[in-house]
Every structure is written in structure tokens, then in C-alpha cells.
Amino acid sequence: MANQKQTTHFGFKSVDWNEKEKKVAEVFHSVAKNYDRMNDLMSLGIHHLWKRYTIELSHVRPGQSVLDLAGGSGDLTRLLSQKVGNSGQVILADINAAMLHVGRDRLLDEGLFKNIRYVQGNAQCLPFADNSFHCITMGFGLRNVTDKDEALQSMYRVCKPGGKLMVLEFSTPVFPGLKPVYDWYSFNILPKIGKFVANDEASYQYLAESIRMHPDQETLKAMIERVGFEDCHYHNLSGGIVALHIAYKY
């Protein structure tokens, strides 16, 4: 699909199709060491609640195989590893080596290693066999993917029949009056926090822009259904600032 499209967006900028992946990699290489601290500051810690809610609705059971895609620093992987137990397995996959190392080191420091594997891989061409996973989670990663349709197709391929996809991502506020306040915070406060804490204003400017450019709830629902997933629905969290999409492969 990529060779059919000449340009895409990197935040608000139009870039060559093959350039976006490189630019996103540079962003996450830059933010990796401060990723957890910045998440806590930017969301006032609420991102932990969003992630716990995702795990609660996953209904993952002992012995199952789970893919935590764009798993980054390992928040979802940690919780999932507790659910699947020693008889199951969680694969933390991320395209970015720096983020993967942060997640691996963090989880190893917490003594979590028996049921976790780490794989560097691209969501658009996942290096796993067909029908491999009972559940696939992707937390705050889809908006950074160059070809979202191709990535969703790849997720569908590796999901087991009867399995579940869960996409947790920034979305479009639905409460009246919330969107302008959220936009003001995103474009005026987030980059300044990035500059102060991580000395990296540009990466957090991209974060704000990438959120604005990401498909809204209904558009993403249609994209997920288009690749073959069924019974797709979503939960608006914090007034739609974040949405959790859940869908099934039958």
C-alpha cells in the first residue's frame, strides 16, 4: 500500500511516505528516557487509570498469548503478564529500539521476565504467524503508524479466531466545551512541559499535532471493521480525550 501513496502527515506537516517512519523514530528515540515521567506529568497520572480499565475489559485469562503492540515502556505488558500467569505469554513489540530497551530494563528491574518476550517489529508487517494471539493491545501507538490500514490488517492476520483487538488512543473530546480547552492545553502547555522536563519542545509539539490528526472515534471504528474485525465498539474515557476501541475476530 505504501508505494501507492506519495505523502502523508507528520503532525501538521506533509512528508514523503517513507520519511514519516524515520521522523517518528527520531521522536521516540529522543523521548524514551523521559517517557514515563512525561506521561505522568502530562496526564496528571490519569493514563494509569485508562490502562487499568483496558486490562479490566480485556478478560485475558491464564495460559493465553497476548501481543502488546507499541508496548513502549511496558505499562500494559506488566498488567497483562499478571493476567496470563506463568502458563501464558505476553510479547512486548515495538518498532523503536530505544523504547523497547526502556520497557525491557524497567520490567526486568521489577522481576518480570518469566512470561514476557521482547520483539522489535513494525506494526504494518508483524513478524508473527497467522492466528497467534488471543488478545492484541495497542496503547497510544496507532496514531504514529504510517499506514494505519496496513497495520490493522496485520493485527487481524495474527489475531486468533475468537480473539480480541483493543486500541487505546487519544481521540476527539465529546463533552461540550472540552475540545477548545483540550486544544489549548495540548498546543500551549504540552510542548512547554516537554521543554522544561526533557529539553525537547519539538517532540511534544509533534505529540499535540499527531493527536489532532488522528481519526475520530467513528472513523477509527470503520477502519477496524473494514479489515475484518467485527462487533467493534468504543468507550470514551475522560470525555473522549481518549477512546478505547474493542473488536473481535470470528
UniProtKB/Swiss-Prot annotation:
Pfam families: Ubie_methyltran (PF01209). GO terms for biological process: aerobic respiration; menaquinone biosynthetic process; methylation. Keywords: Menaquinone biosynthesis, Methyltransferase, S-adenosyl-L-methionine, Transferase, Ubiquinone biosynthesis. S-adenosyl-L-methionine binds at S73, D94, N122, A123. Pathway: Quinol/quinone metabolism; menaquinone biosynthesis; menaquinol from 1,4-dihydroxy-2-naphthoate: step 2/2; Cofactor biosynthesis; ubiquinone biosynthesis. One of its GO terms (molecular function) is 2-methoxy-6-polyprenyl-1,4-benzoquinol methyltransferase activity. It catalyses: a 2-demethylmenaquinol + S-adenosyl-L-methionine = a menaquinol + S-adenosyl-L-homocysteine + H(+); a 2-methoxy-6-(all-trans-polyprenyl)benzene-1,4-diol + S-adenosyl-L-methionine = a 5-methoxy-2-methyl-3-(all-trans-polyprenyl)benzene-1,4-diol + S-adenosyl-L-homocysteine + H(+). PROSITE patterns: SAM_MT_UBIE (PS51608), UBIE_1 (PS01183), UBIE_2 (PS01184). The keyword Glycosyltransferase does not apply. Its EC number is 2.1.1.163, 2.1.1.201. InterPro entries: SAM-dependent_MTases_sf, UbiE/COQ5_MeTrFase, UbiE/COQ5_MeTrFase_CS. Belongs to the class I-like SAM-binding methyltransferase superfamily. MenG/UbiE family. Methyltransferase required for the conversion of demethylmenaquinol (DMKH2) to menaquinol (MKH2) and the conversion of 2-polyprenyl-6-methoxy-1,4-benzoquinol (DDMQH2) to 2-polyprenyl-3-methyl-6-methoxy-1,4-benzoquinol (DMQH2). This is Ubiquinone/menaquinone biosynthesis C-methyltransferase UbiE. It comes from Legionella pneumophila (strain Corby).
